[in-house]
Amino acid sequence: LPTYWEKVRPLLEGSPVKVSSIGFYCNALENEGQRKTLEHFIDNAHLFGTDVVTTFAGALEGQPVEKAIPRYKEVFGELARRAEAKGVRLAIENCPMDGTWHKATCNIGFNPKAWEMMFDAVPSRAIGLEWEPAHQMVQLIDPLPQLEEWADRVYHIHGKDATLHWDRVRKWGVFGAGEFAESRTPGYGDTDWRDVFHILYSRGYVGDLVVEGFHDPIFKEEREWAGQLHALEYLKWCRGGTEESPW
């Protein structure tokens, strides 16, 4: 990372752009090398001017979420102490990575029931969430009440939305016979991001919201940057822009 920072630094000098977080998404519960790399990220986040390292909670792959909690407590207890010493916060992305509660893949931190277990096992405030509505919507979870409840543990936010096709749910169900959810660029999905900002403001959120692209089924390839630029302007307006809304 120090070598990489020397490449990044000239690109940022004289620019208003800052690094909101650095991320290493891994399974530190089962992979010792990945755990060491995550420690390296914690130790070097300060080089990039950020105190947020984003990651996964790990898992015992193929096993239920609750089976991983003792190992999570062991590994992330140590990582939390390291982060506290460095003034760093770990933000666990709320992405299932195609796993389920009964058969997790590389991240148990995708569901609020798991968050309760994780934060009970390791209460340190050095561990929180990297949150977005899309990963909750694909679980048929209403994201806004969830954000209201968990806002004080949200340390970083991805600007990514989803569209739920309820007609497909009614026709095919949710066990994979047909796709019922699509990731969308903010401004094209089901979420009114004014509501997201209202919750963040009311709960005193201090942090960043970054557009996550390369998922939208329409705004991809040659349309990718058009979609991301639209998302940026849309989110700035939802945040409280001064121009009249075109939407």
Segments (PLM) and residue ranges:
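Aromatic- and glycine-enriched glycan-recognition loops and surfaces
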Residues: 1-6, 191-193
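Active-site-proximal beta-strand/loop segments in catalytic clefts of secreted hydrolases
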Residues: 24, 93-95, 160
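Residue-level signal for short, function-critical loop segments
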Residues: 25, 59, 133
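Active-site acidic/histidine proton-transfer and metal-coordination neighborhood
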Residues: 5-6, 11-14, 18, 28-128, ...
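Histidine-acidic metal/acid-base catalytic patches
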Residues: 49, 77, 102, 109-247
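N-terminal small/glycine-rich loop or linker at the start of catalytic domains
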Residues: 18-26, 175-177
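Conserved beta-strand positions in the central sheet of alpha/beta enzyme cores
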Residues: 21, 54, 91, 155-158, ...
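A short, structure-level motif marking secondary-structure boundaries and short turns
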Residues: 25-28, 63-65, 180-183, 217
